[in-house]
């Protein structure tokens, strides 16, 4: 039996979907523990590409139980759309389980997200405007509506009526917008409730029972460590906790039940939206990496900002998550470069910082200190074991391990499931 938590070790978009898909082969359950449809996974199996936002990547295996935990906020229209899209490709969602305690996203959350982002102007966060933040706000304010409420027709109608009364007061009096129609929202969400009711259950019982039975469980986080509401580059963060500790809270298990934590990082680093980015490439090389790596958001289509691998941020992710291993993806994107760089520290007003600062003012003024290593020209997309990689590529990986303090257990050399090198047993 092994319980493995898979987390993003950067600003999200690290390739967690591919790694989850690869590791799901030996898992009995695959569990999503936080976030919403502001995150996206792209998984390539054979000649087919799957883009998932809420459903765990393990759904592509017919014998896996896939779970959406209570830490997730759910847009039921998006979830049902994903289920229907999978069905059209012959993928069953019969093994999907949804937590009764997961909170629901409503049209007023999405509208609030949009109007607040517009109001902030140049001070905007860079939200996806999917309603994620406002849904988590309602959850913390104890006025949210959960899946257990949604599937109870009488309870749901009363809760929605009160929430929409409050939100419409805000829209009309503060923002000068017309009110949302209660009747149409009620009708739509009653339809969603009927479609999803059979999937809604107490997932904590299912997962704890699976642990007792000695099954392998893979917990997958969305976004990444540097977007965590507490540990990320606040306020340019998400509204939930992508870090490993949140896996326990987000599904209803105790911390002693976790056996291993794996962090996923690209061989370089990217971020979407606003916020400081010390190793960002603001030149033609950044454009080259973006195009070669296909660095455009799965959810928004926005171009991602690209930079050299940040070892300071990597060490931070290892520390706050307690990472046992790193999985390094997209190593193939760096093939063909004469030189490759790894940031080992930050120069700040004449001092070297070896740890990731909390202050955005400090982070914005940090200048990366690089180790420069020779690149490799070979096509590595066909490599299936470590010895298949060129010596310079192996040295680059070794240096990442040295700088971050975490051994590398998995290497991605392409987008397909088969384009993976495993160097350690993870279950």
UniProtKB/Swiss-Prot annotation:
NCBIfam families: PRK01117.1 (NF002223), purA (TIGR00184). SMART domains: Adenylsucc_synt. IMP binds at residues 13-16, 38-41, 128, 142, 223, 238, 302. It comes from the Bacteria. Substrate binds at residues 298-304. This is Adenylosuccinate synthetase. InterPro entries: Adenylosuccin_syn_GTP-bd, Adenylosuccin_syn_Lys_AS, Adenylosuccinate_synth_dom1, Adenylosuccinate_synth_dom2, Adenylosuccinate_synth_dom3, Adenylosuccinate_synthetase, P-loop_NTPase. Plays an important role in the de novo pathway of purine nucleotide biosynthesis. Catalyzes the first committed step in the biosynthesis of AMP from IMP. Keywords: Cytoplasm, GTP-binding, Ligase, Magnesium, Metal-binding, Nucleotide-binding, Purine biosynthesis.
């Amino acid at each position: 039996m092994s319980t493995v938590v898979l987390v993003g070790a950067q600003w999200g978009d690290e390739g967690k979907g591919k790694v989850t898909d690869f590791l799901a082969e030996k898992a009995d359950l695959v569990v999503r523990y936080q976030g919403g449809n502001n995150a996206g996974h792209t998984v390539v199996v054979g000649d087919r590409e799957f883009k998932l936002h809420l459903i765990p990547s393990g759904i592509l295996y017919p014998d896996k139980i896939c779970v959406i935990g209570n830490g997730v906020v759910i847009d039921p229209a998006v979830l049902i759309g994903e289920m229907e899209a999978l069905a059209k490709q012959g993928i069953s969602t019969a093994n999907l389980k949804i937590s009764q305690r997961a909170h629901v996203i409503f049209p007023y959350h999405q509208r609030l997200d949009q109007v607040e982002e517009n109001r902030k102007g140049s001070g905007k966060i860079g939200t996806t405007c999917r309603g994620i933040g406002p849904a988590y706000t309602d959850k913390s304010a104890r006025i949210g509506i959960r899946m257990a409420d949604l599937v109870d027709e009488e309870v749901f109608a009363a809760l929605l009526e009160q929430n929409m009364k409050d939100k419409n007061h805000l829209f009309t009096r503060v923002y000068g917008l017309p009110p949302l129609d209660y009747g149409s929202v009620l009708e739509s969400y009653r339809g969603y409730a009927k479609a999803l009711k059979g999937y809604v259950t107490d997932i904590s019982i299912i997962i704890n029972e699976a642990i007792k039975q000695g099954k392998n469980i893979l917990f997958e986080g969305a976004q990444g460590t540097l977007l965590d509401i507490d540990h990320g580059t606040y306020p340019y963060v998400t509204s939930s906790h992508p870090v490993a500790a949140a896996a326990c809270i987000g599904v209803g298990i105790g911390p002693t039940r976790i056996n291993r934590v794996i962090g996923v990082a690209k061989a370089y680093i990217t971020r979407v939206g606003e916020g400081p980015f010390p190793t960002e490439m603001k030149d033609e090389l950044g454009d080259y990496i973006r195009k070669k790596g296909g660095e455009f958001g799965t959810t928004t289509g926005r171009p991602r900002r690209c930079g050299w691998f940040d070892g300071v941020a990597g060490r931070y992710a290892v520390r706050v998550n307690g990472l046992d291993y790193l999985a390094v993806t997209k190593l193939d994107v760096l093939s063909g470069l004469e030189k490759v760089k790894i940031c080992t520290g930050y120069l700040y007003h004449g001092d070297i910082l070896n740890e990731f600062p909390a202050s955005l003012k400090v982070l914005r003024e940090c200048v990366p200190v690089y180790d420069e290593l020779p690149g490799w020209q070979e096509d590595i997309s066909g490599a299936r074991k470590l010895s298949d990689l060129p010596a310079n590529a192996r040295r680059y990986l070794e240096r990442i391990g040295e700088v971050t303090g975490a051994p590398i257990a998995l290497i991605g050399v392409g987008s397909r499931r088969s384009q993976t090198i495993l160097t350690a047993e993870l279950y």
